[in-house]
Amino acid sequence: MDASEVEFLAEKEQVTVIPNFSLDKVYLIGGDLGPFNPSLPVEVPLWLAINLKQRQKCRIVPPEWMDVEKLEAIRDQERREETFTPMPSPYYMELTKLLLNHAADNIPKADEIRTLVKDTWDTRIAKLRLSADSFVKGQEAHAKLDNLTLMEINTIGTFFTESLNHMYKLRTSLQNPEEGQSQDY
């Protein structure tokens, strides 16, 4: 799975919009949406919120966790803890990117929020790299990585898979040295 596929999954997350149009309930395969009434909040998938915003049909309400004080607390906790802390959304990075790219005018203190989420991401990726380093140096057979998001797993997944394959090959060659040194006379 690549980053665009993770972003696609994130677009299914529900967000609140305040429409400026009227429309009865819309029946889709993935569920019913609406009804849409001017100035009345309604929950819709992120992909629809972005589409409506691009057509100037709504205002997007940022998620509750997308607040400077809450994000500062999350960032500080992430820096304090040795383990990964739970994130406010399994798609926090993707939601932030999409909302700030398409609806920054609807998000108070958008630049600060962008910086705080990036700081949190950088801290978590640094922890992930340290975990991978100690995993490889300790010649571990398994690892427990709780509270990672799909994008974080996607970022480090290929490296971990390749590392495990190389470690397996090295271990098997060390356990059977005579098999690797056979020569025909």
Curated annotation (Swiss-Prot):
Source organism superkingdom: Eukaryota
CDD domains for the chain: GINS_A_psf2 (cd11712), GINS_B_Psf2 (cd21694)
InterPro entries, per the entry: GINS_A, GINS_bundle-like_dom_sf, GINS_Psf2, PSF2_N
Keywords tagged on the record: Chromosome, DNA replication, Nucleus
GO cellular component: CMG complex; GINS complex; nucleoplasm; nucleus
Compartment annotation: Nucleus; Chromosome
SUPFAM superfamilies per record: GINS helical bundle-like, PriA/YqbF domain
GO biological process, one term: DNA strand elongation involved in DNA replication
Keyword Nucleus carried by entry: yes
Keyword Nucleus: yes
Alphabetized GO MF terms: chromatin binding
Family: Belongs to the GINS2/PSF2 family.
PANTHER family: DNA REPLICATION COMPLEX GINS PROTEIN PSF2 (PTHR12772:SF0)
Subunit note: Component of the GINS complex which is a heterotetramer of gins1/psf1, gins2/psf2, gins3/psf3 and gins4/sld5. Component of the CMG helicase complex, composed of the mcm2-7 complex, the GINS complex and cdc45.
Function recorded in the entry: Required for correct functioning of the GINS complex, a complex that plays an essential role in the initiation of DNA replication, and progression of DNA replication forks. GINS complex is a core component of CDC45-MCM-GINS (CMG) helicase, the molecular machine that unwinds template DNA during replication, and around which the replisome is built.
Protein name: DNA replication complex GINS protein PSF2
Classification of source organism: Eukaryota, Metazoa, Chordata, Craniata, Vertebrata
Gene that produces this protein: gins2
